From Swiss-Prot:
It comes from the Eukaryota. GO terms for molecular function: SNAP receptor activity. This is Vesicle-trafficking protein SEC22a. Residues 2-187, 248-253, 296-307 are cytoplasmic. It comes from Homo sapiens. The chain crosses the membrane at residues 188-208, 227-247, 254-271, 275-295.
Length: 307
């Protein structure tokens, strides 16, 4: 079940907790997340104003403004746009209720604990999205997140920045390669599916023509071997474009442009065997699939909430 579990208001300069919800669960996972809360609190001044930390089954999101950070813990499948809309509501209410002088001069932890009442009410509303009266305003937040997605904090970055490098240093060396190998892409669009099918079609056409060229080479003394190579290279390029469209890999965009360049070179070499419409079709499909690969980026955020 997707839901908000807890939230805190923290002063950025020193990590002093100003207010928080008081209904933490006592599970092992939740206790671990409380440690991450404390670690993030010490580093808020060094982080961007909108961040996400993924901790397995839970996500920690926060925003910072005017020296105060608003942090929340939710399940990993809680919609990203709702999470940051929730934080935005906390921020607006806190700024309206307390002036900067009070927050800057606060000495005791949780000196604004009465703000917990608003946190609890808002959390209950956001844990029942159907009852939200602010649905109409979520489109603005959705657009903002797409244009400026939250910075993704890695476990290695969090660990090394807080004096606990021994726990993370071994894994950090290869963390980039491991995470990129298992990185998920954004959901496929209709245009992406069409591009995948067209690329398969071009690959099949190149493959058929390649076998015909082999037959021609066996039946005559013509020098068709280079054409065979061009057809099969074109087939491989089309299939590799399909692979790049479906799976994430390092330097994915660069590879897609190089693959498109190979498709263009193959079709230039096959100019004598194809008419202009055939050449135009193959090159256009290659360009279209390259564009779809570029548009379908890795998932850097949780699923959006439909509005």
């Amino acid at each position: 079940m997707s839901m908000i579990l807890s939230a805190s208001v923290i002063r950025v300069r020193d990590g002093l907790p100003l207010s928080a919800s008081t209904d933490y669960e006592q599970s092992t996972g939740m206790q671990e997340c409380r440690k991450y809360f404390k670690m993030l609190s010490r580093k808020l001044a060094q982080l961007p104003d909108r961040c996400t930390l993924k901790t397995g089954h839970y996500n920690i999101n926060f925003i910072s403004s005017l020296g105060v950070s608003y942090m929340m813990l939710c399940t990993e499948n809680y919609p990203n746009v709702l999470a940051f809309s929730f934080l935005d509501e906390l921020q607006k209410e806190f700024i309206t209720t307390y002036n900067m002088m009070k927050t800057n001069t606060a000495v005791r932890p949780y000196c604004f604990i009465e703000f917990d009442n608003f946190i609890q009410r808002t959390k209950q509303r956001y844990n029942n999205p159907r009852s939200l009266s602010t649905k109409i305003n979520l489109s603005d937040m959705q657009t903002e997140i797409k244009l400026r997605p939250p910075y993704q904090i890695s476990m290695c970055e969090l660990g090394s920045a807080n004096g606990v490098t021994s726990a993370f240093s071994v894994d950090c060396k290869g963390a980039g390669k491991i995470s990129s190998a298992h990185q998920r892409l954004e959901p496929a669009t209709l245009s992406g599916i069409v591009g995948f099918i067209l690329s398969l079609l071009c690959g099949a056409l190149n493959l058929i023509r390649g076998f015909h060229a082999i037959e021609s080479l066996l039946q005559s003394d013509g020098d068709d071997f280079n054409y065979i190579i061009a057809f099969f290279l074109g087939t491989a390029a089309c299939l590799y474009q399909c692979y790049l469209l479906v799976y994430y890999t390092g330097w994915r965009n660069v590879k897609s442009f190089l693959t498109f360049g190979l498709i263009c070179l193959c079709n230039m070499y096959l100019y004598e065997l194809r008419n202009l419409w055939q050449l135009f079709f193959h090159v256009t499909v290659g360009a279209f699939v390259t564009l779809q690969i570029w548009l379908r980026q890795a998932q850097g955020k949780a699923p959006d909430y439909d509005v």
